[in-house]
Amino acid sequence: MKKTGILNSDISRVVADMGHMDWLGIGDAGTPVPKTTEKIDLAVSAGMPSFISVLKEVLKELQVQKIYVADEIKDSNPKQLENIKRILPDVEIKFIPHTQLKKNLSEAKAFIRTGEETPFSNVILESGVIF
């Protein structure tokens, strides 16, 4: 049995397979996931697990150089945006329309669905390199 880090075998596999500039999505329970993108469904109930708790765990194992966030989060969920900025202080944030973010998920290796039920709690992580 794995002792530390991400215990979910699907997330662990996807993170280990990420190359430079690959994309991984994490988001709320209502995010539509393209049929071409692997969906890793962690949602248990409303709010469980939270978007931020899953994001924090993934960031312990994945080097990220840029994130894509829906522009609408600025007005509709500024608290969540502040949470994202706080845990990714040195990572470039690119704001794009929510419709574009949803389309871009078709290019992601996978999407992790959380139990989050707050608007625009979605992010696409672009992997970096550790050297």
Curated annotation (Swiss-Prot):
GO terms for molecular function: D-ribose pyranase activity; intramolecular lyase activity; monosaccharide binding. It is found in: Cytoplasm. It catalyses: beta-D-ribopyranose = beta-D-ribofuranose. One of its GO terms (cellular component) is cytosol. Coiled coil: none annotated. The active site is at residue 20. Gene3D superfamilies: RbsD-like domain. The keyword Iron does not apply. Its EC number is 5.4.99.62. One of its GO terms (biological process) is D-ribose catabolic process. Pathway: Carbohydrate metabolism; D-ribose degradation; D-ribose 5-phosphate from beta-D-ribopyranose: step 1/2. It comes from the Bacteria. Keywords: Carbohydrate metabolism, Cytoplasm, Isomerase. Substrate binds at residues 28, 98, 120-122. InterPro entries: D-ribose_pyranase, RbsD-like_sf, RbsD_FucU. Pfam families: RbsD_FucU (PF05025). Catalyzes the interconversion of beta-pyran and beta-furan forms of D-ribose. Belongs to the RbsD / FucU family. RbsD subfamily. Homodecamer. This is D-ribose pyranase. It comes from Lactobacillus acidophilus (strain ATCC 700396 / NCK56 / N2 / NCFM). The lineage of its organism: Bacteria, Bacillati, Bacillota, Bacilli, Lactobacillales.
